[in-house]
Swiss-Prot record:
Protein source organism: Shewanella sp. (strain MR-7)
Record keywords: Arginine metabolism, Hydrolase, Metal-binding, Zinc
CDD domains, per database record: M14_ASTE (cd03855)
Catalyzed reaction equations: N-succinyl-L-glutamate + H2O = L-glutamate + succinate
Family: Belongs to the AspA/AstE family. Succinylglutamate desuccinylase subfamily.
InterPro entries associated with the record: AspA/AstE_fam, AstE_AspA_cat, Aste_AspA_hybrid_dom, SuccinylGlu_desuccinylase
Gene Ontology BP annotations: arginine catabolic process to glutamate; arginine catabolic process to succinate
Protein name in UniProt: Succinylglutamate desuccinylase
Gene name of the encoded protein: astE
Cofactor notes: Binds 1 zinc ion per subunit.
Amino acid sequence: MLQALLDSKDFLALTLANPETLGDEFSFALGEHTRVEVWDTGVIVFEPAQAQGKDVILSCGVHGNETAPIELCNTLIKQLLQQKIIAKQRTLFLIGNPLAINNGTRIIDENMNRLFSGEHSNPPGLVNPERVRAKKLEAYVDRFFKGAAAGRQRIHYDLHTAMRASKHEKFAIYPYRPGRAYSAEQIMFLAASGVDTVLFHHEPTTTFSYFSSEQYGADAFTIELGKVYPMGQNDMTRFIAAQEMFMRLITDKPLALEPFSADKVNLYQVCRVINKHFDDFEFTFATDVENFRSFPKGFVLAREGGQEIKVEQEFEAIVFPNAKVPIGNRTVICLIPSVAPDVR
């Protein structure tokens, strides 16, 4: 495995050729500046000899068909392995769901991004590949963050693409973080990366980014970088800004961020999440409606069990509508403009 990686510098190819395991862990040096550790398939760490003050996680492929972030991360990994760029911050790359990537599908059995914060082991337990992998990914995050001295800034960007078009092509979900202000620096880093829209979540979830935020105090985000396309069919020029900013972060180059200003970004607050309670749940709008479509108060969004679900606020925008989820799961997130969020 080691020689294959040294020869190809293609960690994604190695991962997809061995989607369940690489066998034993292995490590090697890049010159005298970086130690590389491979902990598992899809799990690679870059440890600088003289690390600066940040611990950075870039995860992708939690959903197997969201290919642009996978290609973006593999490009960064390849540049690091080729020593075209040199890591100055401790960096962990996670390719989340290799089996689903090989399958060309979002999932194998279950949505992995609902299985963190221990949800993987709740009934029915570790019964499918996503549950087993989510538990392992949690352990790798724990090992990485605890593998350095306390007091370092912890960052986790969980990279995705959405199943539908969007009024705002690139957007981020800021996990619920009671008692902690939102980071102005992080919001402006996202804006510089081309991610000009942020959703402030209103409650705990079982997503990967919430896990890192809640368990480790990380500045963590679920970042949607555009629309789903098959592997190799992404227009990677649309991700130049994101790739550049991630490279600058990892290599400790100046970020040159603008000061925070609410008029430079689109800020939304999650006002509610609508879950499915009956098999007959259906939306009233077209199946191809774009994310962030806004509806007025009183508009019937959906029907189920003989009841109508209406817009409650003056206007509510929607993201991630999906009526074909299991009972008990989220069908849509409803948003309102965020007024005076605690951003510092």
